[in-house]
Every structure is written in structure tokens, then in C-alpha cells.
């Protein structure tokens, strides 16, 4: 899969060892120019510098994706750097935390989970859609198996509800942007094998590899998936 000449924006890719690092490398290895976005400036610069050291095309941008003005400014910077043409947006920003039983939960945690998992996605999509229309590009969002029917979600009210709302947002975008040629899809991966997850959940948990997730993201952003939109793809 050749992606030379394409510009790809990836959010939430600052932390070393996480899936975003592998997804970004997969795009860059195939010739794409990647714009890495995270609120942690030093971390996202480290990820970008590693790609640059390998002779790949990368730029690091820091932004608070929960702030509408900051996201609009981010999109403007990318617009200026790409002549207004972005081919793919991969939104990995988010976070997981148990909120406990509903009757005992903290409303502040509910708000926090919706902010990091839903509001950031909405604001990022809103800001970058004009740039994606120019290329009939693709958007990929990271959902969760916790948002799917039959999932075991006890103690996860805030997280599961936020991710469920995210999947609905993806449906809305897919329907609204169909005529413009912009595609929107979501992944619902199983637990991803990272050092942090293994430490938290143990080595015997059934994991999906970061590389397997990256391959699905690449496909959804490629011309091979040009007729696929509004879908939730499970990765196990």
C-alpha cells in the first residue's frame, strides 16, 4: 500500500509504547507525511523525532483537543502546511478509567470521560472536515468493545457511555459527509498488547497486537476501502 504524497493527521500519539506510535510509523513507512498531535509537547516531539531520524516525513504539533479554539488553531496550522489538503484523520486521543457502580460514581469522572473520549473527537472532526472534503478523505476513530452489544461493562458507565456516543457520532458524520466523499469509520479493538496493558491485566489476557490494529487503520484510510463508511470494525 503506497501512500506517498498523502497527509495524515494522528491525534493522541504522544505516549511511547502505545498503539498510536505503531500506527504513525505504518503510515510514514508507506510514504505519508504524518502530523502527530498530542497535548504533551515533549512526548509528541520525541515520537516525531524518531520518525525523522529514520528518514520519514513527520511533524509534531501540541494542542488541547478539548478546547475548541485550540483545535481550530491546530487545523489552521495543518491547513497552511498542506495547502488545505488532508487525506486522513486518525483520532486516537482518549482514555480509559473505571468509574465504579453508577450509584457510587463521581459526576466529575463522568464529565472527564466524555470530554476526553467524545468532545475531543467532535471538536477534531469539526475542525478537520473542510480539509478532508478537499481530498475525499477518511476519518478513523477509536471506539471500544465496551460500546458494543453484550459487552461486560459493570463499573464502566462513564467510559462505555462515552464510547457508545462516539460510535453514534461516527454514524452521523458518515451520513452527513457521504455526498462530499468523506468516509468515517470506527475501530472497536479488543485489549491491545502494550507493556502497560500487560502490567494491568496480566499476560494471559487475549490481546490484539498494535501491528494488527495499524493494518486495519491503514486499510480504512486507503483507496481499497473507498466504499466503506459508517462502519464499526472489530479487531481481535
Question: What positions do the PLM features span?
Answer:
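Conserved NAD(P)H cofactor-binding loop of Rossmann-fold oxidoreductase domains
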Residues: 92-99
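Canonical Rossmann dinucleotide-binding motif of NAD(H)/NADP(H)-dependent dehydrogenases/reductases
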Residues: 2-35
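The beta1-alpha1 cofactor-binding region of Rossmann-like NAD(H)/NADP(H)-dependent oxidoreductases
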Residues: 42, 62-74, 107
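Substrate-binding pocket helix/loop in short-chain dehydrogenase/reductase
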Residues: 100-102, 109-111
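C-terminal helical subdomain
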Residues: 179-182, 186-187, 202-236
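Catalytic loop of short-chain dehydrogenase/reductase
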Residues: 12, 138-165, 170-179, 191, ...
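A short, exposed helix-loop element centered on a Lys and neighboring polar residues
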Residues: 125-126, 171
Amino acid at each position: 500500500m503506497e501512500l506517498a504524497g498523502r497527509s495524515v493527521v494522528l491525534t493522541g500519539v504522544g505516549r511511547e509504547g502505545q498503539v498510536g506510535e505503531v500506527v504513525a510509523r505504518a503510515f510514514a513507512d508507506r510514504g505519508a507525511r504524518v502530523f502527530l498531535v498530542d497535548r504533551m509537547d515533549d512526548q509528541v516531539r520525541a515520537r516525531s523525532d524518531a520518525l525523522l531520524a529514520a528518514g520519514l516525513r513527520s511533524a509534531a504539533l501540541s494542542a488541547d483537543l478539548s478546547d475548541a479554539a485550540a483545535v481550530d488553531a491546530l487545523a489552521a496550522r495543518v491547513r497552511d502546511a498542506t495547502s488545505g489538503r488532508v487525506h486522513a484523520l486518525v483520532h486516537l486521543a482518549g482514555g480509559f478509567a473505571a468509574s465504579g457502580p453508577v450509584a457510587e460514581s463521581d459526576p466529575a469522572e463522568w464529565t472527564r470521560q466524555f470530554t476526553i473520549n467524545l468532545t475531543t473527537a467532535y471538536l477534531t472532526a469539526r475542525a478537520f472536515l473542510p480539509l478532508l472534503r478537499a481530498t475525499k478523505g477518511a476519518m478513523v476513530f477509536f471506539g471500544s468493545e465496551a460500546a458494543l452489544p453484550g459487552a461486560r461493562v459493570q463499573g464502566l458507565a462513564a467510559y462505555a457511555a462515552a464510547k457508545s456516543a462516539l460510535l453514534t457520532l461516527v454514524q452521523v458524520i458518515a451520513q452527513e459527509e457521504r455526498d462530499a466523499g468523506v468516509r468515517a469509520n470506527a475501530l472497536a479493538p479488543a485489549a491491545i498488547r502494550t507493556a502497560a496493558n500487560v502490567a494491568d491485566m496480566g499476560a494471559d489476557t487475549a490481546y490484539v497486537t498494535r501491528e494488527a490494529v495499524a493494518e486495519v487503520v491503514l486499510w480504512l484510510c486507503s483507496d481499497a476501502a473507498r466504499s466503506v463508511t459508517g462502519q464499526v470494525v472489530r479487531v481481535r
